[in-house]
């Protein structure tokens, strides 16, 4: 009986410790993720963030987005966007799950091939792009420092040669320092 009580107390202590390691003021996180867009492109991101309070996270990162667009008569071309992001997240901890609704600014550049895959000249130029995004992340904390993240994301680029509105979903890993 004494052994069962000790094991129960150890399990409770471990669960409390795991939860206490996530989301304290001054804590820093690093995350990477990858996924797809509704247009069939690929996205990836690397981010860092700092907890300003148990619920407020301020951070930044870099996002990559590559899409192949179809042109006329079976032709196609690739477009790439590199975007820096500044984001604010509101963290809601639910035991091992953390809900992270967030939003922020996107600033970066977009580039496109000069020639299509069939050799046709394209009318697009490399340019500076900017916009906004909203993300509704969920993470599952599986150890003191590691979490798996799922990030559905909506982004709106105000100045772009291509699609202004993109919907994407990505999965990744987050490390809590």
Predicted regions and their residues:
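Cleavable N-terminal export/targeting peptides
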Residues: 1-25
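Transmembrane beta-strand segments of Gram-negative outer membrane beta-barrel proteins
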Residues: 22-36
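Residue-level preference for beta-strand/loop junctions
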Residues: 26, 40, 80-82, 128-130, ...
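Gram-negative (and chloroplast) outer-membrane scaffold detector with strong preference
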Residues: 50-120, 127-135, 140-148, 172-177
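Hydrophobic secondary-structure block in the mid-to-C-terminal portion of proteins
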Residues: 155-177
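Solvent-exposed loop/turn segments connecting transmembrane beta-strands
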Residues: 32-44, 73-76, 158-166
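Extracytoplasmic loops and strand-loop junctions of Gram-negative outer membrane beta-barrel proteins
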Residues: 28-32, 70, 117-121, 153-156
